[in-house]
Curated annotation (Swiss-Prot):
Family assignment from sequence similarity: Belongs to the protease inhibitor I48 family.
Functional description taken from the UniProt entry: Binds and inhibits cysteine proteinases. Inhibits most strongly papain and cathepsin L, more weakly bromelain and cathepsin B while it is completely ineffective against cathepsin H.
Protein name: Clitocypin-6
GO molecular function: cysteine-type endopeptidase inhibitor activity
Any Pfam family: Inhibitor_I48
Provenance organism: Clitocybe nebularis (Clouded agaric)
Subunit structure: Homodimer.
Keyword line: Protease inhibitor, Thiol protease inhibitor
Length: 152
């Protein structure tokens, strides 16, 4: 599996069945510290809050940190709880597993590195908010949320 290079990216919400839906779309957008991360269009006033520093750690997992201007402290993809539909919070950056979607070069499933019997906890979108979704590990859950990582 190809690993993502460290760098600054925009993260566009796509799906595993439609990893390249064309023009437009919604991107991971920070609203503020301890606030849910939103999915917004890549237009003013949102686009300046859509830069994310993705860094691979020694254990092969990644942190996704907000890379905006004038941030008084470091925050990134985080969580208070990993329950179905709980929001992704802009907080103390947690580690994630990035799983490349087959037949793509820049589309990944973002998974929380936790052990739950028979399921994966993955980052998706619900009503313009990034949330944690539960999918069976056997692939029977259908179309999964995925993210196109566009290098900036």
């Amino acid at each position: 599996m190809a690993s993502l290079e460290d760098g600054t990216y925009r993260l566009r919400a796509v799906t595993t069945h439609n990893p390249d839906p064309g023009v437009g779309g919604e991107y991971a957008t920070v609203e503020g510290a301890r606030q849910p991360v939103k999915a917004e269009p890549n237009t003013p006033p949102f686009f300046e809050r859509q830069y994310w520093q993705v860094t691979r750690n020694a254990d092969g997992q990644y942190t996704i940190k907000y890379q905006g201007l004038n941030t008084p402290f470091e925050y990134g993809f985080s969580y208070d709880e990993l329950e179905p539909n709980a929001p992704v919070i802009a907080g103390d950056p947690k580690e994630y597993i990035l799983q490349l979607v087959p037949s793509t070069t820049d589309v990944y499933i973002i998974r929380a590195p936790i052990q739950r019997v028979g399921v994966d906890v993955e980052v998706g979108v619900q009503e313009n908010t990034l949330v944690y979704k539960i999918f069976p590990v056997d692939g029977s859950g259908g179309d999964k949320a995925a993210w196109r990582f566009t290098r900036e």
